[in-house]
Design a protein with these regions (language model features):
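Conserved nucleotide-binding/hydrolysis micro-motifs of P-loop NTPases
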Residues: 15, 31, 77-78, 101-104, ...
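Catalytic P-loop NTP-binding/switch module of NTPases
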Residues: 225-351, 373, 555
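Conserved C-terminal guanine-recognition region of P-loop GTPase G domains, centered on the G4
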Residues: 94-156
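Conserved catalytic-core segments of large NTP-driven translation/proteostasis enzymes
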Residues: 148-282, 286, 401-404, 465, ...
Length: 598
């Protein structure tokens, strides 16, 4: 009888998932007394910490009362949907973490639906009950309604609820009586989460995730489904296409605390990492060499969006970056394919650009941002959705969009979404907020987030997820305003910007270096405007240069990477270097642009 519990944690961004896991690790005495307790232990790459999102699923385990609890952290974001399904396959139960004030959110729904379909047993944790005006009882009912609407079984609906505050480090069965520690939660896990079934027979393991090490290459991570795996065992890798490849296990590690520990053998029900198997894909089976039986493969989410990646060929090429040639960028993209599953890289006609396919703007921008920090320079074109031909009809990806926002600005948002070919499927009001659901083409979502936040003064919460391919919906107006383009290369002067303020809003500040063909602002009209922002005031001997009028300029609009990618038009690129991000026309020369435009 093994004392193992495999549990996945499901939560919305910023409901305290990573903090809770930190506290569970503490309870399992992973950090020695007196050793500094780290924050956000699981989000261990800088990007994850800054954005507060978990991108890659991770595994840790703790020992408690002689039980081994494997904790599997899932990404909450629908752009990383490929990660979610695979990871839930390793668990027997799930911890649904909700904020006692906000209640379950659209993104939580996405992961929870997958978990319920797989038949996982849930435990609900109502977090942040120490906050004033929290409403645990109402939230409890909301969770019940949500599970009911996702067709949960009676057994799943009979879930225990634990209340507490991960930040203060306590959990209790009654929210009015705080305890000292989180043992109430750990006891509930042992009591309610079923133990993994032990299946005797020839060994089988489904590869659900992979790790990468520069010493041994790709490492297969998964849960042993049946039998046991031993070090040095001869195995068969059952591929997706039905073929079999013989291989041998060099080393087996199990997860122990935050790291891995080498073991001789691992039994069914435990999660392990296997070193020495080459050329595997996620969703394939490792089986006994003498009697190979493949498990059903898992489908990985298809990409729905593509962007052109190309080398930086702007006049400021190579000023900041360490890696700037096409060779560097190509190698880096190939390396990313090893661990990023929903990604595809396709060469184009030219030797220095590639089409990169991904799950959405966020998915691709996380890759670009990671590359930027590593010292790469590159340029990226406008995001395009992937169009398929189904039964001779042109089809495009359609997503389900949920928006939660204050009632007074709902009409503006509905108008905005319907202009982008969205159709409303549901509308309900709760207290003073509206909950809206739409189906909308993926093309319509590009750039929508910004517009929705502006129209609702930052109050709206928006989430979307891929639904299916549907027939093409027709043209969608993206951005109607033209661009303001720099005429010459040089330094921008306040004097020039001041005279041009009536022409639109600027993205640059005085003193910034610009080059000819760079997009420096947004024109108030719908055509492009070429201006000289490098002009300074000419002075005679009579005028001292200091006695100029003080210039008052509106502050420049600053874009985040996603905003810029969603903002640019089809004839523009975003140039990304370690220290800066600029938008530019693909053809820098004005005369050449006019010639092409004819």
């Amino acid at each position: 009888m093994q004392k193992i519990r495999n549990i996945a944690i499901i939560a919305h961004v910023d409901h305290g998932k990573t903090t809770l896991v930190d506290k569970m690790l503490l309870a399992g005495k992973l950090f020695r007394e007196g050793q500094a307790e780290p924050d956000q232990f699981l989000d261990n790459n800088d990007l994850e910490r800054e954005r507060g999102i978990t991108i890659l699923a991770k595994n840790v385990s703790i020992n408690y009362k002689g039980y081994k609890i494997n904790i599997i952290d899932t990404p909450g974001h629908a752009d990383f949907g490929g990660e979610v399904e695979r990871v839930l396959n390793m668990a027997d139960g799930c911890l649904l973490l909700v904020d006692a004030f906000e209640g379950p959110m659209p993104q939580t729904r996405f992961v929870l639906q997958k978990a319920i379909q797989l038949g996982l047993k849930p435990i609900v944790v109502s977090n942040k009950v120490d906050k004033p005006n929290c409403r645990p009882e109402e939230v409890q009912e909301m969770v019940f309604d949500l599970m009911f609407s996702l067709d949960a079984t009676e057994e799943q609906l009979d879930f225990p609820t634990i209340y507490g505050s991960a930040k203060q480090g306590w959990m209790s069965e009654d929210w009015k009586e705080p305890k000292e520690d989180i043992t109430a939660l750990l006891d509930a896990i042992i009591q309610y989460i079923p133990e993994p079934q032990v299946l005797e027979g020839s060994s089988q393991m489904l590869i659900t995730s992979l790790d990468y090490s520069k010493y041994v290459g790709r490492i297969a991570v998964g849960r042993v489904h049946r039998g046991e795996l031993r070090e040095g065992q001869e195995i068969m890798l059952c591929k997706r296409d039905g073929s079999m490849v013989k291989s041998k296990i060099k080393e087996i590690d199990v997860f122990e605390g935050l790291g891995r520990t080498k073991v001789d053998a691992v039994q069914s029900g435990d999660i392990c990492a296997i070193i020495g198997v080459e050329g595997f894909e996620i969703g394939e089976t490792i089986a006994d060499a003498n009697d190979p039986e493949p498990l059903p493969t898992i489908a990985i989410d298809e990409p729905t969006m593509s962007m052109l990646f190309t080398i930086n060929n702007s006049p400021f090429f190579g000023k900041d970056g360490k890696f700037v040639t096409s060779r560097h960028i190509y190698d880096r993209l190939m390396k990313e394919l090893d661990k990023n599953l929903a990604l595809r890289v396709v060469p184009t006609d030219s030797a220095d650009s590639w089409l990169v396919y991904g799950r959405g703007v966020l998915h691709l921008s996380v890759l670009i941002e990671t590359m930027r920090r590593e010292g790469y320079e590159l340029q990226v074109g406008q995001p395009q959705v992937i169009i398929k031909e189904i039964d001779g009809e042109k089809c495009e990806p359609v997503e389900q969009l949920t928006v939660n926002l204050p009632e007074e600005c709902s009409s503006r948002i509905i108008d905005m979404v319907t202009k982008r070919k969205g159709e409303m499927t549901m509308m309900e009001s709760k207290n003073d907020r509206m909950h809206l659901e739409f189906t909308i083409p993926s093309r319509g979502i590009i750039g929508l987030n910004n517009a929705v936040l502006t129209a609702s003064a930052g109050e709206a919460i928006m989430a979307h997820r891929f639904l299916e391919y549907q027939p093409w919906k027709g043209e969608i107006e993206r951005r109607t305003n033209g661009s303001i383009i720099a005429m010459e290369t040089g330094t921008a002067y306040a004097y020039a910007l001041n005279n041009l303020q009536s022409r639109g809003r600027f993205f640059i500040a005085p003193g910034d270096e610009v080059y000819a063909g760079q997009v420096v602002g947004e024109h108030t009209k719908d055509n492009d405007l070429v201006v000289n922002v490098t002009k300074s005031k000419k002075l005679t001997n009579m005028r001292a240069s200091g006695s100029d009028d003080k210039v008052s300029l509106a502050p420049p609009t600053v874009f985040s990477l996603e905003d810029a990618l969603e903002y640019i038009k089809g004839d523009e690129y975003v140039e990304i270097t370690p220290n800066s991000m600029r938008m530019r026309k693909i053809i820098l020369d004005e005369l050449e642009r006019k010639r092409q435009g004819r």
